[in-house]
Curated annotation (Swiss-Prot):
GO terms for biological process: chemotaxis; signal transduction. GO terms for cellular component: plasma membrane. Disruption phenotype: Mutants have general chemotaxis defects in media that are low in magnesium. SUPFAM superfamilies: Methyl-accepting chemotaxis protein (MCP) signaling domain. The gene is mcpA. It is a single-pass membrane protein. It comes from the Bacteria. It comes from Pseudomonas aeruginosa (strain ATCC 15692 / DSM 22644 / CIP 104116 / JCM 14847 / LMG 12228 / 1C / PRS 101 / PAO1). This is Methyl-accepting chemotaxis protein McpA. Involved in chemotaxis. Required for an optimal chemotactic response. The chain crosses the membrane at residues 36-56. Keywords: Cell inner membrane, Cell membrane, Chemotaxis, Membrane, Methylation, Transducer, Transmembrane, Transmembrane helix.
Amino acid sequence: MRESLGVSLPSRPLLLKLGLLSLPWALCAGLHAVGLGVWLVLALGWFASLAMLVLLLRAPRQAVANANPQADAASPAWSAAQRALADETAQLDGHARQIDELLHSAIRQLSDSFHGLAERIDTQRGLSHSLIERYDGRGQVDEGINFQDFVRTTQQTLSLFVEATLETSRTSQQLVERMDQVRLKITEILQSTQDMDAIAKQTNLLALNAAIEAARAGESGRGFAVVADEVRALSTRSTEFSAAIRKHVDVVHHEIQDAESAISQLADKDMSFALDSKHKIQGMLDDLEAMNRHTLKVIHELDRLSLEVGQGVDAAVTALQFQDMGSQLLGQMRKHHARLGAFALGLGALEARPRQEWPERVAREVEELRRPLPSPVSQNSVNVGEVELF
């Protein structure tokens, strides 16, 4: 059939080998589809392909030993296999470098973002601590006074004001009592002026009687009549003077009554106003104290949340170190790629060697390929294990 069509198709063993080599990559594609990381999928695919290639290349020694003259006459295309392997390893190495660059760029941006977030959280915690020190009164404040000192100073000032007002009210009460005593004294003075009026009237009456008697005496009573006139004049002046005193004392008496009433009202008003103001201000200070306690509670809660967020950021920054492990694993993959490339070069060089040397050289290349390389990462999680630092 192949001769009739004029087309040279691959042999069945070659198709079987190609199918076996593509099987690991198909499995890795399925793992990537379910969410496995691309760099881990590439590593698994490469190691699986390498193992499959080693298994397929175990046969050359036995095949050469049992080959018939017709098989020896056919020369394998080692250079073509070498070029195919070299192209494949170059593509794998390019993908590994691309993954490394993408990881490095993304992790650097994430790390910078987390470090900036950590700095802002530290600033927020510092502000919270300054508010706590200012509101709870336990810390030293560089400028001004804290809230507790403000409340305490306000209470002391208001207490002094209330005490001064109460003392003024008490003094006003004492002044009212003194004014009452003065009012009583003025009442007595008014009573005395009335007595003086009565005396003046009696004196005037006596002077009038004396003048009458002097007129009856005639010439001998003339001198006595003069004295009687003077006594009457003195009595009149005493009456006028007593009236003037009574008038002034009445004015003073009314003024003192008005002053006593005003002082009494002021004392009562100051007392009630001071007590009422004291109660209201004490209620306001109690409300401020309750508000202060609530504010402190909220600030403490914010400080606790900031601490937890900071710890989460630190844990995230620590977890970002997986980029170092990924880079080292990708570097390890490039080493294996280089060994695979050297193995391909060795296969390509077999064309220039006698066929009798092929089994030995292939076995030597396979042995070199099987030689293990030290792994820089000995863990499968970022939480445990060690990483070889660059």
